[in-house]
Protein backbone atom coordinates (compact mmCIF):
# COMPACT_ATOMS: atom_id res chain seq x y z
CA UNK A 1 0.00 0.00 0.00
CA UNK A 2 1.37 3.41 -1.00
CA UNK A 3 1.05 5.93 1.82
CA UNK A 4 0.19 8.64 -0.73
CA UNK A 5 -3.01 6.71 -1.46
CA UNK A 6 -3.73 5.54 2.08
CA UNK A 7 -5.84 7.16 4.81
CA UNK A 8 -3.61 7.60 7.85
CA UNK A 9 -4.55 10.69 9.91
CA UNK A 10 -1.54 11.00 12.24
CA UNK A 11 -1.84 13.37 15.23
CA UNK A 12 1.31 15.28 16.15
CA UNK A 13 0.26 16.09 19.72
CA UNK A 14 -0.86 13.82 22.53
CA UNK A 15 -4.67 13.98 22.91
CA UNK A 16 -5.61 15.48 26.26
CA UNK A 17 -8.45 13.01 26.83
CA UNK A 18 -6.17 9.96 26.60
CA UNK A 19 -5.31 8.67 30.09
CA UNK A 20 -3.28 5.56 29.20
CA UNK A 21 -0.61 4.69 26.65
CA UNK A 22 -2.74 2.51 24.37
CA UNK A 23 -5.49 5.14 24.06
CA UNK A 24 -2.96 7.87 23.36
CA UNK A 25 -1.03 5.89 20.76
CA UNK A 26 -4.13 4.57 19.00
CA UNK A 27 -5.41 8.12 18.57
CA UNK A 28 -2.03 9.51 17.53
CA UNK A 29 -1.37 6.68 15.07
CA UNK A 30 -4.69 7.25 13.34
CA UNK A 31 -6.11 3.88 14.36
CA UNK A 32 -9.39 5.03 15.91
CA UNK A 33 -11.58 8.09 16.28
CA UNK A 34 -14.02 8.66 19.13
CA UNK A 35 -17.58 9.20 17.89
CA UNK A 36 -19.29 9.23 21.30
CA UNK A 37 -18.33 8.34 24.86
CA UNK A 38 -16.90 4.81 24.71
CA UNK A 39 -17.75 4.41 21.00
CA UNK A 40 -15.04 4.43 18.35
CA UNK A 41 -14.72 4.32 14.59
CA UNK A 42 -11.93 1.97 13.54
CA UNK A 43 -9.85 3.75 10.90
CA UNK A 44 -7.95 1.75 8.24
CA UNK A 45 -4.74 1.12 10.22
CA UNK A 46 -6.62 0.09 13.36
CA UNK A 47 -9.08 -2.01 11.40
CA UNK A 48 -6.23 -4.01 9.86
CA UNK A 49 -4.93 -4.85 13.34
CA UNK A 50 -8.44 -5.73 14.52
CA UNK A 51 -8.82 -8.11 11.58
CA UNK A 52 -5.47 -9.77 12.34
CA UNK A 53 -6.46 -10.29 15.98
CA UNK A 54 -9.87 -11.62 14.97
CA UNK A 55 -8.31 -14.08 12.53
CA UNK A 56 -5.96 -15.54 15.14
CA UNK A 57 -8.91 -16.03 17.50
CA UNK A 58 -10.89 -17.69 14.70
CA UNK A 59 -8.06 -20.02 13.73
CA UNK A 60 -7.56 -21.23 17.29
CA UNK A 61 -11.27 -21.73 17.88
CA UNK A 62 -11.47 -23.80 14.70
CA UNK A 63 -8.36 -25.77 15.72
CA UNK A 64 -10.05 -26.66 19.02
CA UNK A 65 -13.11 -27.97 17.18
CA UNK A 66 -15.48 -25.05 17.74
CA UNK A 67 -17.98 -24.18 14.99
CA UNK A 68 -18.61 -20.58 13.94
CA UNK A 69 -22.04 -18.98 13.52
CA UNK A 70 -23.31 -15.42 13.79
CA UNK A 71 -26.06 -14.16 16.08
CA UNK A 72 -27.73 -10.75 15.81
CA UNK A 73 -26.85 -7.78 17.98
CA UNK A 74 -30.52 -7.18 18.87
CA UNK A 75 -32.31 -9.69 21.09
CA UNK A 76 -35.86 -10.08 22.38
CA UNK A 77 -36.38 -9.03 25.99
CA UNK A 78 -38.70 -12.01 26.55
CA UNK A 79 -35.80 -14.36 25.88
CA UNK A 80 -33.87 -12.84 28.77
CA UNK A 81 -36.93 -12.95 30.98
CA UNK A 82 -36.94 -16.75 30.67
CA UNK A 83 -33.64 -16.88 32.55
CA UNK A 84 -34.44 -14.00 34.90
CA UNK A 85 -31.56 -11.94 33.57
CA UNK A 86 -33.56 -9.12 31.98
CA UNK A 87 -34.21 -7.35 35.27
CA UNK A 88 -31.09 -8.62 37.02
CA UNK A 89 -28.56 -7.35 34.48
CA UNK A 90 -28.90 -3.71 35.49
CA UNK A 91 -28.40 -0.35 33.77
CA UNK A 92 -25.48 -1.55 31.62
CA UNK A 93 -28.01 -3.19 29.31
CA UNK A 94 -29.31 -0.94 26.52
CA UNK A 95 -33.07 -1.52 26.33
CA UNK A 96 -35.01 -0.35 23.28
CA UNK A 97 -38.41 -0.73 21.60
CA UNK A 98 -39.21 -1.10 17.93
CA UNK A 99 -42.10 0.66 16.14
CA UNK A 100 -44.49 -2.06 17.32
CA UNK A 101 -43.54 -1.45 20.96
CA UNK A 102 -41.78 -4.80 21.19
CA UNK A 103 -39.09 -4.77 23.85
CA UNK A 104 -35.60 -5.46 22.57
CA UNK A 105 -32.08 -5.12 23.90
CA UNK A 106 -28.66 -4.59 22.38
CA UNK A 107 -26.90 -7.77 23.38
CA UNK A 108 -24.21 -7.48 26.05
CA UNK A 109 -23.75 -11.27 25.85
CA UNK A 110 -25.47 -14.25 24.18
CA UNK A 111 -25.97 -17.15 26.59
CA UNK A 112 -29.77 -16.83 26.44
CA UNK A 113 -29.96 -16.65 22.64
CA UNK A 114 -27.57 -19.52 21.99
CA UNK A 115 -29.56 -21.67 24.42
CA UNK A 116 -32.76 -20.81 22.53
CA UNK A 117 -31.11 -21.78 19.24
CA UNK A 118 -29.76 -25.01 20.68
CA UNK A 119 -33.04 -26.14 22.22
CA UNK A 120 -34.82 -25.62 18.89
CA UNK A 121 -32.65 -28.20 17.13
CA UNK A 122 -30.83 -30.52 19.53
CA UNK A 123 -32.64 -33.22 21.49
CA UNK A 124 -30.32 -36.24 21.70
CA UNK A 125 -27.04 -37.00 23.43
CA UNK A 126 -25.85 -38.31 20.06
CA UNK A 127 -25.56 -34.69 18.88
CA UNK A 128 -23.21 -33.81 21.75
CA UNK A 129 -20.72 -32.44 22.55
CA UNK A 130 -20.80 -29.18 20.62
CA UNK A 131 -18.94 -25.88 20.90
CA UNK A 132 -20.41 -22.97 18.93
CA UNK A 133 -18.90 -19.51 18.69
CA UNK A 134 -19.39 -16.16 17.05
CA UNK A 135 -17.47 -12.88 16.76
CA UNK A 136 -19.85 -9.96 17.10
CA UNK A 137 -20.13 -6.39 18.36
CA UNK A 138 -21.56 -5.91 21.86
CA UNK A 139 -22.80 -2.95 23.82
CA UNK A 140 -22.67 -2.35 27.56
CA UNK A 141 -23.65 1.07 28.82
CA UNK A 142 -20.66 1.63 31.09
CA UNK A 143 -21.29 4.42 33.58
CA UNK A 144 -17.80 5.77 33.04
CA UNK A 145 -16.23 4.59 29.79
CA UNK A 146 -12.52 5.33 29.75
CA UNK A 147 -9.14 4.15 28.52
CA UNK A 148 -10.18 4.06 24.87
CA UNK A 149 -10.99 0.59 23.53
CA UNK A 150 -9.92 -0.95 26.83
CA UNK A 151 -13.15 0.06 28.52
CA UNK A 152 -15.53 1.20 25.81
CA UNK A 153 -19.26 0.83 25.56
CA UNK A 154 -19.23 -0.83 22.14
CA UNK A 155 -16.69 -3.61 21.64
CA UNK A 156 -15.97 -6.68 19.55
CA UNK A 157 -16.14 -10.03 21.33
CA UNK A 158 -15.60 -13.64 20.52
CA UNK A 159 -18.14 -15.67 22.49
CA UNK A 160 -18.07 -19.46 22.50
CA UNK A 161 -20.61 -21.76 24.13
CA UNK A 162 -20.25 -25.45 24.97
CA UNK A 163 -23.03 -28.03 25.22
CA UNK A 164 -22.50 -31.36 26.99
CA UNK A 165 -24.61 -34.12 28.51
CA UNK A 166 -22.91 -34.18 31.90
CA UNK A 167 -20.44 -32.32 34.07
CA UNK A 168 -17.54 -34.55 33.07
CA UNK A 169 -18.06 -33.71 29.41
CA UNK A 170 -18.54 -30.02 30.20
CA UNK A 171 -15.21 -29.88 31.98
CA UNK A 172 -13.53 -31.46 28.96
CA UNK A 173 -14.99 -28.66 26.81
CA UNK A 174 -13.79 -26.13 29.39
CA UNK A 175 -10.30 -27.58 29.13
CA UNK A 176 -10.33 -27.29 25.34
CA UNK A 177 -11.14 -23.60 25.50
CA UNK A 178 -8.61 -23.05 28.29
CA UNK A 179 -5.83 -24.48 26.11
CA UNK A 180 -7.06 -22.63 23.01
CA UNK A 181 -6.87 -19.35 24.94
CA UNK A 182 -3.28 -20.00 25.98
CA UNK A 183 -2.42 -20.39 22.30
CA UNK A 184 -4.38 -17.31 21.19
CA UNK A 185 -2.50 -14.95 23.46
CA UNK A 186 0.90 -16.51 22.79
CA UNK A 187 0.43 -16.05 19.04
CA UNK A 188 -0.22 -12.37 19.67
CA UNK A 189 3.01 -11.96 21.59
CA UNK A 190 1.29 -11.72 24.96
CA UNK A 191 1.93 -13.46 28.26
CA UNK A 192 -1.56 -14.10 29.60
CA UNK A 193 -2.01 -15.77 32.98
CA UNK A 194 -5.17 -17.79 33.71
CA UNK A 195 -6.38 -16.78 37.16
CA UNK A 196 -9.22 -18.01 39.32
CA UNK A 197 -12.01 -15.46 39.14
CA UNK A 198 -15.58 -14.57 40.07
CA UNK A 199 -18.27 -15.68 37.64
CA UNK A 200 -20.27 -12.43 37.90
CA UNK A 201 -23.59 -12.10 36.02
CA UNK A 202 -22.72 -15.02 33.70
CA UNK A 203 -23.11 -17.39 36.65
CA UNK A 204 -21.67 -20.80 37.50
CA UNK A 205 -19.07 -22.02 39.96
CA UNK A 206 -15.89 -22.31 37.89
CA UNK A 207 -14.15 -19.51 36.04
CA UNK A 208 -10.72 -18.27 35.01
CA UNK A 209 -9.80 -14.83 33.74
CA UNK A 210 -6.85 -14.52 31.39
CA UNK A 211 -4.79 -11.61 32.65
CA UNK A 212 -1.95 -9.55 31.20
CA UNK A 213 0.17 -7.85 33.84
CA UNK A 214 0.16 -4.08 33.33
CA UNK A 215 0.27 -1.05 35.60
CA UNK A 216 -2.84 0.30 33.86
CA UNK A 217 -4.86 -2.83 34.69
CA UNK A 218 -8.31 -2.42 36.18
CA UNK A 219 -7.84 -4.83 39.08
CA UNK A 220 -5.23 -6.20 41.45
CA UNK A 221 -3.94 -9.70 40.76
CA UNK A 222 -1.77 -12.12 42.70
CA UNK A 223 0.33 -14.99 41.37
CA UNK A 224 3.44 -17.10 41.59
CA UNK A 225 6.02 -15.71 39.16
CA UNK A 226 6.83 -19.23 37.90
CA UNK A 227 3.54 -19.16 35.99
CA UNK A 228 5.16 -16.69 33.60
CA UNK A 229 7.58 -19.37 32.38
CA UNK A 230 5.16 -22.25 31.80
CA UNK A 231 5.23 -23.75 28.28
CA UNK A 232 2.42 -23.01 25.84
CA UNK A 233 0.84 -25.99 24.01
CA UNK A 234 1.89 -26.07 20.35
CA UNK A 235 -0.22 -26.27 17.20
CA UNK A 236 -0.06 -30.08 17.23
CA UNK A 237 -1.99 -30.31 20.50
CA UNK A 238 -4.61 -33.07 20.33
CA UNK A 239 -7.82 -31.45 21.54
CA UNK A 240 -9.55 -34.84 21.58
CA UNK A 241 -6.85 -36.24 23.85
CA UNK A 242 -6.25 -35.80 27.56
CA UNK A 243 -5.65 -32.11 28.25
CA UNK A 244 -5.78 -32.44 32.03
CA UNK A 245 -1.97 -32.46 32.49
CA UNK A 246 -1.80 -29.06 30.77
CA UNK A 247 -4.63 -27.70 32.90
CA UNK A 248 -3.08 -29.07 36.08
CA UNK A 249 0.27 -27.49 35.26
CA UNK A 250 -1.32 -24.08 34.71
CA UNK A 251 -3.66 -24.17 37.72
CA UNK A 252 -1.42 -25.74 40.38
CA UNK A 253 0.51 -22.52 40.97
CA UNK A 254 -1.29 -19.73 42.82
CA UNK A 255 -2.92 -17.18 40.51
CA UNK A 256 -6.06 -15.25 41.44
CA UNK A 257 -7.85 -11.98 40.85
CA UNK A 258 -8.59 -9.75 43.82
CA UNK A 259 -12.26 -10.88 43.93
CA UNK A 260 -11.28 -14.42 44.96
CA UNK A 261 -7.82 -13.75 46.41
CA UNK A 262 -6.99 -15.71 49.58
CA UNK A 263 -4.11 -13.89 51.25
CA UNK A 264 -3.40 -16.69 53.73
CA UNK A 265 -3.26 -19.31 51.00
CA UNK A 266 -1.12 -17.08 48.79
CA UNK A 267 1.44 -16.64 51.56
CA UNK A 268 1.47 -20.32 52.52
CA UNK A 269 1.77 -21.63 48.95
CA UNK A 270 4.09 -19.04 47.44
CA UNK A 271 7.62 -18.22 48.67
CA UNK A 272 8.13 -14.47 49.27
CA UNK A 273 10.62 -14.14 46.41
CA UNK A 274 8.09 -15.61 43.96
CA UNK A 275 5.07 -13.52 44.91
CA UNK A 276 3.75 -11.11 42.29
CA UNK A 277 1.23 -8.48 43.36
CA UNK A 278 0.41 -6.32 40.34
CA UNK A 279 -2.38 -4.77 38.34
CA UNK A 280 -3.77 -6.76 35.44
CA UNK A 281 -5.79 -6.36 32.24
CA UNK A 282 -8.44 -8.99 31.58
CA UNK A 283 -8.38 -10.13 27.94
CA UNK A 284 -10.64 -13.18 28.21
CA UNK A 285 -12.65 -15.32 30.59
CA UNK A 286 -13.92 -18.90 30.62
CA UNK A 287 -16.94 -20.13 32.61
CA UNK A 288 -18.53 -23.44 33.46
CA UNK A 289 -22.11 -22.72 34.50
CA UNK A 290 -23.85 -26.10 34.31
CA UNK A 291 -27.65 -25.82 34.04
CA UNK A 292 -27.94 -22.07 34.68
CA UNK A 293 -29.53 -21.44 31.27
CA UNK A 294 -30.65 -24.86 30.08
CA UNK A 295 -32.80 -25.55 33.15
CA UNK A 296 -34.99 -22.41 33.21
CA UNK A 297 -35.26 -22.46 29.40
CA UNK A 298 -36.00 -26.22 29.39
CA UNK A 299 -33.38 -27.08 26.83
CA UNK A 300 -33.48 -30.82 27.47
CA UNK A 301 -31.34 -33.63 26.10
CA UNK A 302 -32.41 -37.27 25.95
CA UNK A 303 -29.63 -39.42 27.38
CA UNK A 304 -28.63 -43.01 26.57
CA UNK A 305 -31.11 -44.31 29.16
CA UNK A 306 -34.02 -42.44 27.56
CA UNK A 307 -34.37 -39.85 30.33
CA UNK A 308 -34.37 -36.10 29.68
CA UNK A 309 -32.19 -33.59 31.48
CA UNK A 310 -30.84 -30.07 30.87
CA UNK A 311 -27.52 -29.85 29.08
CA UNK A 312 -24.40 -28.77 30.91
CA UNK A 313 -23.08 -25.48 29.55
CA UNK A 314 -20.07 -23.22 29.50
CA UNK A 315 -19.21 -19.88 27.91
CA UNK A 316 -15.89 -18.49 26.80
CA UNK A 317 -15.22 -14.86 25.92
CA UNK A 318 -12.29 -13.07 24.29
CA UNK A 319 -12.29 -9.28 24.07
CA UNK A 320 -11.13 -8.91 20.46
CA UNK A 321 -11.15 -5.11 20.29
CA UNK A 322 -9.81 -4.83 23.84
CA UNK A 323 -6.88 -7.04 22.84
CA UNK A 324 -5.66 -4.38 20.42
CA UNK A 325 -5.25 -1.96 23.31
CA UNK A 326 -3.78 -4.63 25.57
CA UNK A 327 -1.10 -5.52 23.03
CA UNK A 328 -0.05 -1.86 22.87
CA UNK A 329 0.03 -1.61 26.67
CA UNK A 330 2.39 -4.59 26.69
CA UNK A 331 4.50 -3.57 23.69
CA UNK A 332 5.50 0.07 23.21
CA UNK A 333 8.27 2.54 23.91
CA UNK A 334 8.60 6.33 24.04
CA UNK A 335 8.52 6.57 20.24
CA UNK A 336 5.34 4.59 19.73
CA UNK A 337 3.83 1.16 19.24
CA UNK A 338 5.89 -2.02 18.77
CA UNK A 339 3.61 -4.52 17.02
CA UNK A 340 4.25 -8.26 17.29
CA UNK A 341 4.55 -9.43 13.70
CA UNK A 342 1.43 -11.63 13.86
CA UNK A 343 -0.90 -8.68 14.44
CA UNK A 344 0.97 -5.81 12.77
CA UNK A 345 -1.13 -3.85 10.25
CA UNK A 346 1.80 -4.08 7.83
CA UNK A 347 4.98 -6.11 8.22
CA UNK A 348 7.28 -3.58 6.56
CA UNK A 349 7.43 0.19 6.41
CA UNK A 350 9.36 1.26 3.31
CA UNK A 351 10.65 4.85 3.42
CA UNK A 352 11.78 6.67 0.29
CA UNK A 353 14.01 9.48 1.56
CA UNK A 354 14.17 11.36 -1.74
CA UNK A 355 11.00 11.01 -3.77
CA UNK A 356 11.68 12.14 -7.33
CA UNK A 357 15.23 10.88 -7.44
CA UNK A 358 15.29 8.32 -10.25
CA UNK A 359 17.60 5.81 -8.57
CA UNK A 360 15.83 6.02 -5.20
CA UNK A 361 12.39 5.71 -6.78
CA UNK A 362 13.51 2.71 -8.84
CA UNK A 363 15.04 0.93 -5.83
CA UNK A 364 11.91 1.49 -3.73
CA UNK A 365 9.68 0.29 -6.56
CA UNK A 366 11.74 -2.89 -6.89
CA UNK A 367 11.66 -3.62 -3.16
CA UNK A 368 7.95 -2.85 -2.92
CA UNK A 369 6.98 -5.04 -5.87
CA UNK A 370 9.18 -7.97 -4.87
CA UNK A 371 7.99 -8.01 -1.26
CA UNK A 372 4.36 -7.70 -2.32
CA UNK A 373 4.89 -10.65 -4.69
CA UNK A 374 6.13 -12.67 -1.69
CA UNK A 375 2.93 -11.86 0.20
CA UNK A 376 4.58 -9.40 2.58
CA UNK A 377 2.34 -6.50 3.65
CA UNK A 378 4.24 -3.28 2.88
CA UNK A 379 3.34 0.32 3.66
CA UNK A 380 5.40 2.39 1.21
CA UNK A 381 5.96 5.98 2.29
CA UNK A 382 6.21 7.65 -1.10
CA UNK A 383 5.18 11.07 0.22
CA UNK A 384 7.34 14.19 0.10
CA UNK A 385 7.53 14.44 3.90
CA UNK A 386 10.98 15.18 5.32
CA UNK A 387 13.10 12.16 6.44
CA UNK A 388 12.72 12.96 10.15
CA UNK A 389 8.96 12.99 9.79
CA UNK A 390 9.03 9.64 8.02
CA UNK A 391 11.19 8.06 10.72
CA UNK A 392 8.92 9.37 13.50
CA UNK A 393 5.82 8.14 11.70
CA UNK A 394 7.22 4.64 11.21
CA UNK A 395 8.25 4.43 14.87
CA UNK A 396 4.84 5.67 15.98
CA UNK A 397 2.80 3.14 14.00
CA UNK A 398 5.17 0.37 15.07
CA UNK A 399 5.61 -1.82 11.99
CA UNK A 400 8.04 -4.67 12.75
CA UNK A 401 10.58 -3.75 10.06
CA UNK A 402 11.64 -0.47 8.48
CA UNK A 403 13.44 -0.38 5.14
CA UNK A 404 15.03 3.02 4.53
CA UNK A 405 16.19 3.94 1.04
CA UNK A 406 18.16 7.10 0.24
CA UNK A 407 20.59 8.31 -2.44
CA UNK A 408 23.65 8.20 -0.17
CA UNK A 409 23.24 4.55 0.75
CA UNK A 410 22.30 3.54 -2.76
CA UNK A 411 25.53 5.07 -4.06
CA UNK A 412 27.30 2.43 -1.94
CA UNK A 413 24.88 -0.31 -2.97
CA UNK A 414 23.27 -0.40 0.48
CA UNK A 415 19.92 0.28 2.09
CA UNK A 416 19.13 0.36 5.79
CA UNK A 417 16.90 -2.14 7.55
CA UNK A 418 15.73 -1.49 11.11
CA UNK A 419 14.01 -3.94 13.44
CA UNK A 420 11.47 -1.93 15.45
CA UNK A 421 11.44 -4.17 18.53
CA UNK A 422 15.20 -4.05 19.13
CA UNK A 423 16.26 -0.93 17.27
CA UNK A 424 18.93 -2.98 15.49
CA UNK A 425 20.03 -1.51 12.15
CA UNK A 426 21.77 -3.22 9.25
CA UNK A 427 23.10 -1.98 5.92
CA UNK A 428 22.21 -4.53 3.27
CA UNK A 429 21.90 -4.95 -0.46
CA UNK A 430 18.44 -5.08 -2.00
CA UNK A 431 18.90 -8.80 -2.64
CA UNK A 432 19.83 -9.41 1.01
CA UNK A 433 16.77 -7.51 2.24
CA UNK A 434 14.46 -9.53 0.01
CA UNK A 435 16.17 -12.72 1.18
CA UNK A 436 15.19 -11.90 4.79
CA UNK A 437 11.54 -12.32 3.86
CA UNK A 438 11.87 -15.49 1.79
CA UNK A 439 12.98 -17.80 4.60
From Swiss-Prot:
Keywords: Aminoacyl-tRNA synthetase, ATP-binding, Cytoplasm, Ligase, Nucleotide-binding, Protein biosynthesis. GO terms for biological process: prolyl-tRNA aminoacylation. It is found in: Cytoplasm. InterPro entries: aa-tRNA-synt_IIb (IPR002314), aa-tRNA-synth_II (IPR006195), aa-tRNA-synth_II/BPL/LPL (IPR045864), Anticodon-bd (IPR004154), Anticodon-bd_dom_sf (IPR036621), Pro-tRNA-ligase_IIa (IPR002316), Pro-tRNA-synth_IIa_bac-type (IPR004500), Pro-tRNA_synthetase (IPR050062). Its EC number is 6.1.1.15. GO terms for molecular function: ATP binding; proline-tRNA ligase activity. It comes from the Bacteria. Its main location: cytoplasm. Pfam families: HGTP_anticodon, tRNA-synt_2b. It catalyses: tRNA(Pro) + L-proline + ATP = L-prolyl-tRNA(Pro) + AMP + diphosphate. It is an enzyme of class 6 (ligase). One of its GO terms (cellular component) is cytosol. The keyword Transport does not apply. Homodimer. Belongs to the class-II aminoacyl-tRNA synthetase family. ProS type 2 subfamily. Catalyzes the attachment of proline to tRNA(Pro) in a two-step reaction: proline is first activated by ATP to form Pro-AMP and then transferred to the acceptor end of tRNA(Pro). This is Proline--tRNA ligase. The gene is proS.
Amino acid sequence: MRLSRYFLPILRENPKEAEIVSHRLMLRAGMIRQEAAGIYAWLPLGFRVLQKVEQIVREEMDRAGAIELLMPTLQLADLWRETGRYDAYGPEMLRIKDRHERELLYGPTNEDMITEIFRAYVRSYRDLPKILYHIQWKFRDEQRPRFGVMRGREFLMKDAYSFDLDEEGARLSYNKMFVAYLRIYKRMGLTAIPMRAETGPIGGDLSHEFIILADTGESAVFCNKDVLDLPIPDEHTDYDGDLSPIIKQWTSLYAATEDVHDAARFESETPPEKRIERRGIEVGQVFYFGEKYSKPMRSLITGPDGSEKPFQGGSYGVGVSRLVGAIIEASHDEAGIIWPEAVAPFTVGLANLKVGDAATDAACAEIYERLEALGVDVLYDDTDDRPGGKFAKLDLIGLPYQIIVGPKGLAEGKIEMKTRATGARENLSIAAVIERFTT
